[in-house]
């Protein structure tokens, strides 16, 4: 293999730049040229492709976002549109592609693989919802961003004796809510994977109040429903002074944590190794702190699951 491409797609996550850097430097170490594809699959279709050198990825390992930019490209689901992308890859002499992103990005890589072009997926999403890996690039940074925000909100909640409902990202996966809620001692954690009884939530809050608790924190993943509606329901049912905070896109930004930088470096380099070995159609991950790779089609057939033991622990500790 003489030449590979790399792109980032979908929602950005801290550590994507570290992964790009690892792909470029690992490939050049093996005398392979690397071409960056800008704006994800949209840039692939339009031919926004440029050669990357060692200097192209200097001074980016500590930066959030993605040097290659990113975009969503729903039209890439069309086989004819994908053929245009493959034509662009062949036009530039690119023989393999590293795709850094989440579920939608993996779907694109899977489709390219099925159409005969070798791709390797690298899990880059703050949601931590990609099958075949314990952690995704960006999750740890986003988690620490959320924890820092909740710590600050708890200070004001304590001062004003208020109940706070805090909405975090996670449309289909509750990992951010669960990990942050457990780390911050939230009184209640609501996630899409687990049904909840609003009457039980209110009863828990009232029990806390009866034993002298002056404030409470409820962490809600966005996929559960409107945090504003949940906050109104709580205030009406308890008469507690209740506020709602939606953390939003602040969770995606910021300098990546050491863990995300190292994870991204390991996974990006491993993706290049797989392409060199002629193993396209794979996705890389980390399980039990060991690098692994899976068939991307088989991986996407699996479903991300929440850590049931951790969820149960959060309930037991929030009595």
From Swiss-Prot:
Its main location: cytoplasm. It is found in: Cytoplasm. It holds the Pfam family PFK. GO terms for biological process: canonical glycolysis; fructose 1,6-bisphosphate metabolic process; fructose 6-phosphate metabolic process. Mg(2+) binds at residue 103. Keywords: Allosteric enzyme, ATP-binding, Cytoplasm, Glycolysis, Kinase, Magnesium, Metal-binding, Nucleotide-binding, Transferase. CDD domains: Bacterial_PFK (cd00763). ATP binds at residues 11, 72-73, 102-105. Substrate binds at residues 125-127, 162, 169-171, 222, 243, 249-252. ADP binds at residues 21-25, 154, 185-187, 211, 213-215. It catalyses: beta-D-fructose 6-phosphate + ATP = beta-D-fructose 1,6-bisphosphate + ADP + H(+). One of its GO terms (cellular component) is 6-phosphofructokinase complex. Pathway: Carbohydrate degradation; glycolysis; D-glyceraldehyde 3-phosphate and glycerone phosphate from D-glucose: step 3/4. The active site is at residue 127. Its cofactor is Mg(2+). Its EC number is 2.7.1.11. Homotetramer. Belongs to the phosphofructokinase type A (PFKA) family. ATP-dependent PFK group I subfamily. Prokaryotic clade 'B1' sub-subfamily. Catalyzes the phosphorylation of D-fructose 6-phosphate to fructose 1,6-bisphosphate by ATP, the first committing step of glycolysis. This is ATP-dependent 6-phosphofructokinase. It comes from Bacillus cereus (strain B4264). The lineage of its organism: Bacteria, Bacillati, Bacillota, Bacilli, Bacillales. The gene is pfkA.
């Amino acid at each position: 293999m003489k030449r590979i491409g790399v792109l980032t797609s979908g929602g950005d996550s801290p550590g994507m730049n570290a992964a790009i850097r690892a792909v470029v430097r690992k490939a050049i170490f093996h005398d392979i040229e690397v071409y960056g594809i800008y704006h994800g699959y949209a840039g692939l279709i339009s031919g926004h492709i440029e050669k990357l050198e060692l200097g192209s990825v200097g001074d980016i390992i500590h930066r959030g976002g993605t040097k290659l930019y990113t975009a969503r490209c729903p039209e890439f689901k069309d086989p004819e549109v994908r053929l245009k992308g493959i034509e662009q890859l062949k036009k530039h002499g690119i023989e393999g592609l590293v795709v850094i992103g989440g579920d939608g990005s993996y779907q694109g890589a899977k489709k390219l693989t099925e159409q005969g072009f070798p791709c390797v997926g690298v899990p880059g999403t703050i949601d931590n919802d990609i099958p075949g890996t314990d952690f995704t690039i960006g999750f740890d940074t986003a988690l620490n961003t959320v924890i820092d925000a909740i710590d600050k909100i708890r200070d004001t909640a304590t001062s004003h004796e208020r109940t706070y409902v805090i909405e975090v990202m996670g449309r289909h996966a509750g990992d951010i809510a669960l990990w942050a809620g457990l780390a911050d001692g939230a009184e209640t954690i609501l996630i899409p994977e687990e049904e909840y009884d609003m009457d039980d939530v209110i009863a828990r809050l009232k029990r806390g109040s009866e034993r002298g608790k002056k404030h409470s924190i409820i962490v809600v993943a966005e996929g559960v429903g409107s945090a504003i509606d949940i906050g109104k329901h709580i205030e009406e049912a308890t008469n507690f002074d209740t506020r709602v905070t939606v953390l939003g896109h602040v969770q995606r930004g910021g300098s990546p944590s050491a863990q995300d930088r190292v994870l991204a470096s390991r996974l990006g380099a491993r993706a290049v190794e797989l392409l060199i070995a002629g193993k396209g159609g794979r996705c890389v991950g980390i399980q039990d702190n060991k690098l692994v790779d899976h068939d991307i089609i088989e991986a996407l057939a699996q479903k991300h699951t929440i850590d049931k033991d951790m969820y149960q622990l959060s309930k037991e500790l929030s009595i």
